[in-house]
């Protein structure tokens, strides 16, 4: 009743990488082998038998020296030893073994591979964090007012399929490296402050324009942004 079944050697991601966890022999007996061994001992007049020597304990099917297991360990570590830094100008995301370990899968050929689906799910998380197309932004006007500017058609959109492929290709190259995402839409600046300190500000209500370069006001002038009589109103 208290017999322990054998456990196969298997792979686990540890702080040292992809490691083979050795098999456990256990104490489970093969009942048919025990019966045959005892029967044979009785027939030979033996007073005792060694069940271990007779091979009566069930054995694990996969041991730590298994060639396929060793191959898979080495394949997994080839991936886990790579670090890919994804550059977002003033911010970075790191794809290392802590991120990558959940992407490891066994393919149809029995080799360790990277799951495109799981990698794409990671890229989708990046999109939630870094896509900015059409989002509103805080802005301080030339006269010091803190306002919110509507997003319009300005901003960044990560291309999920191309970015996923780019990350996986970088990992499979075996070389740690820094990459930039692939984008469907791009803006002037990738920093968190996408407007920066060089821009033109126009106030429709005041009919005035300011031009800042590197944070310095270079031009301040009145403008006419439309013509009501011709139906060219600006809003």
Please report, for each region that a protein language model flagged, where it lies by residue.
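Surface-exposed, secretory/extracytoplasmic low-complexity segments enriched in Ser/Thr/Asn/Gly/Pro
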Residues: 1-235
């Amino acid at each position: 009743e208290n017999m322990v079944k054998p456990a196969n050697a298997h792979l686990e991601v540890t702080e040292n990488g992809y490691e083979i966890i050795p098999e456990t022999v256990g104490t489970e007996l093969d009942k048919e082998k025990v019966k045959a061994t005892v029967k044979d001992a009785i027939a030979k007049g033996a007073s005792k038998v060694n069940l271990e020597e007779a091979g009566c304990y069930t054995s694990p099917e996969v041991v730590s020296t298994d060639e396929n297991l060793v191959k898979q360990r080495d394949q997994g570590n080839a991936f886990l030893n790579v670090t890919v830094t994804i550059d977002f100008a003033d911010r970075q995301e790191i794809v290392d073994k802590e991120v990558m370990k959940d992407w490891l899968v066994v393919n149809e050929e029995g080799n360790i591979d990277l799951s495109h689906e799981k990698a794409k799910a990671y890229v989708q998380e990046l999109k939630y964090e870094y896509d900015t197309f059409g989002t509103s932004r805080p802005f301080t006007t030339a006269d010091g007012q803190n306002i919110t500017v509507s997003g319009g058609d300005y901003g960044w959109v990560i291309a999920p399929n191309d970015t996923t492929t780019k990350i996986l290709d970088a990992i499979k190259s075996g070389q740690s490296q820094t990459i930039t995402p692939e984008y469907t839409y791009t803006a002037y600046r990738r920093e968190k402050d996408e407007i920066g300190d060089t821009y033109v500000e126009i106030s429709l209500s005041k009919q005035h324009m300011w031009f800042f370069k590197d944070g310095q006001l270079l031009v301040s002038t009145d403008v006419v942004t439309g013509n009501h009589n011709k139906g060219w109103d600006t809003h």
